[in-house]
């Protein structure tokens, strides 16, 4: 069985009750429908993957190279295009160009990895961006309470090391949260209720895949 995955839209968070009447915080994800536009094989492309398309878009907004890809697959253009890597080269045989994928590929109680783009926070200091403790609130500290401190020696090493944590733009990064429980699959509405929070803003694009560390298929 191939590793499963689907593109979707984060609709927001809510809470539901489980069978023991306990409140469970869940993120609502509109999963699919996705269309398989291309199948990559080790013989032809050097790796095994499935290309998925999702979302509506006016054909006039799609450039000619991408329009050619959709035309070759016999599919109307979509807004988003992404590849799902397959761990087993033989798994590509389970997919066909033009095949439609919906929320039904997942089941209640399965575990997934969710990838999205985190919210942008703008320019942030080291305390917010990296969790620095800051400097003393008193005892001679004047206007340095939130400063990071030294970033390197003057004579040795006479430079700032790469990767030194400093102030800068925070957020708007690709983030993956692993091992989230699928609380419920609403096949009628094409919705996944995923326990916990997933990255990104409401209305953002997310990729939901089988949990790799749990060996989910």
From Swiss-Prot:
Keyword Ribonucleoprotein (UniProt): yes
Transmembrane regions listed in the UniProt entry: none
InterPro entries named in the record: Ribosomal_uL3, Ribosomal_uL3_bac/org-type, Ribosomal_uL3_CS, Transl_B-barrel_sf
Domain of life according to the entry: Bacteria
A Gene Ontology term for the protein's cellular component: cytosolic large ribosomal subunit
Pfam families according to UniProt: Ribosomal_L3
Function: One of the primary rRNA binding proteins, it binds directly near the 3'-end of the 23S rRNA, where it nucleates assembly of the 50S subunit.
Annotated protein name in UniProt: Large ribosomal subunit protein uL3
The species this protein was found in: Mycolicibacterium paratuberculosis (strain ATCC BAA-968 / K-10)
Taxonomic placement: Bacteria, Bacillati, Actinomycetota, Actinomycetes, Mycobacteriales
């Amino acid at each position: 069985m191939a590793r499963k995955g689907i593109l979707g839209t984060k609709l927001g968070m809510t809470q539901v009750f489980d069978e023991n009447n306990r409140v469970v915080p869940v993120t609502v994800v509109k999963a699919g429908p996705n269309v398989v536009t291309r199948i990559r094989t080790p013989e032809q492309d050097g790796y095994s993957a499935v290309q998925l398309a999702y979302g509506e878009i006016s054909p006039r907004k799609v450039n000619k190279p991408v329009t050619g890809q959709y035309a070759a697959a016999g599919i109307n253009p979509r807004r988003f295009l992404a590849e799902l890597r397959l761990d087993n080269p033989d798994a590509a045989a389970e997919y066909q160009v033009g095949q439609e994928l919906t929320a039904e590929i997942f089941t209640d109680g399965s575990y997934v990895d969710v990838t999205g783009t985190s919210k942008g926070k703008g320019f942030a200091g080291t305390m917010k961006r990296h969790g620095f403790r800051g400097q003393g609130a008193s005892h001679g500290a004047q206007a340095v309470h939130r400063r990071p401190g030294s970033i390197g020696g003057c004579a040795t090493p006479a430079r700032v090391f790469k990767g030194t944590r400093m102030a800068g733009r925070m957020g708007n990064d690709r983030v993956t949260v692993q091992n989230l429980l699928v609380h419920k699959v609403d096949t009628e509405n094409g919705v996944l209720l995923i326990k916990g929070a997933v990255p990104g803003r409401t209305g953002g694009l997310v990729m939901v895949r089988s949990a790799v560390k749990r060996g989910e298929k």
